[in-house]
Amino acid sequence: MGLFGGGNSKSTSNQTTNNENTNIATQGDNLGAVINGNGNSVTMTDHGLVDALVDIGGYMSDSTQAAFGAASDMAYSSTEFAGQAITDGFDYAEGVNRDSLDMAEGINRDSLNFGRDALSVTGDLMTDAMQYSSDAMLASIEGNAGLAGQVMDASTTMTGQSLNFGLDTFSGAMDSLNQSNNNMALLAEFTSNQSTDLARDSMAFGADLMAQYQDNISASNYDAREHMLDASKTAMQFADNMSRSDGQQLAKDSNKTLMIGIVAVSAAVGLYAISKGVN
């Protein structure tokens, strides 16, 4: 060992890193998360749960819109049908009233024509009788003064009979005209009452029909909402059950089952709402 000499030392260190693959299958309330890792790389998957729920939400939204759209269309159709029923009732009542008034007008016109013709015939008979009496009187005076008294008596009698016949005919025509006017007044009153009753019944029928349709639509909407709530609860239960699955393939199968079930329930709700509104 010299003056400036020193000691020598040597050391060796070894380190070994082992990488292991670890798959962890989870159970319980884990929200559908499955974690697996390889060394420092860790991945987590829900096996399509979120995407499935998004698709299901879209299906449920479309089904709800279709159901409420059908209910809205049925409400509009029922209101339009009730309004048309009321309009048709008034149109029918107006037609009946018009026909009745036209018939009464025709009867009155025929009665007036009959009275006019009767008075015309009576006037002609009286004119002819008086002319015949005048002619007979002149003939008797000119031909045989002895028969003048008898001719005058005969003429007077014939004139009286003609006047009586004309008076009876005139009275009969007036009685017939009065009776026709009375019948026309009764017919007009009857048709007016019938038209009023028909219009009232048409309005009552329209109101009842509208109320019935509104009740059906309200019941349909209520049932549709209840079915949608049940479908939502079922979807959430499926999602919860799926999140508790023990393997990747079982989770995928649960997703498909959930989507098919929700689509079927939504279609059933729409058909039920439509059939309820139609009935």
UniProtKB/Swiss-Prot annotation:
<feature type="region of interest" description="Disordered">
    <location>
        <begin position="1"/>
        <end position="28"/>
    </location>
</feature>
<dbReference type="GO" id="GO:0016020">
    <property type="term" value="C:membrane"/>
</dbReference>
<keyword id="KW-1133">Transmembrane helix</keyword>
<feature type="transmembrane region" description="Helical">
    <location>
        <begin position="256"/>
        <end position="273"/>
    </location>
</feature>
<keyword id="KW-0812">Transmembrane</keyword>
<protein>
    <recommendedName>
        <fullName>Uncharacterized protein Gp-j</fullName>
    </recommendedName>
</protein>
<dbReference type="GO" id="GO:0033644">
    <property type="term" value="C:host cell membrane"/>
</dbReference>
<feature type="compositionally biased region" description="Low complexity">
    <location>
        <begin position="9"/>
        <end position="23"/>
    </location>
</feature>
<keyword id="KW-0472">Membrane</keyword>
<keyword id="KW-1043">Host membrane</keyword>
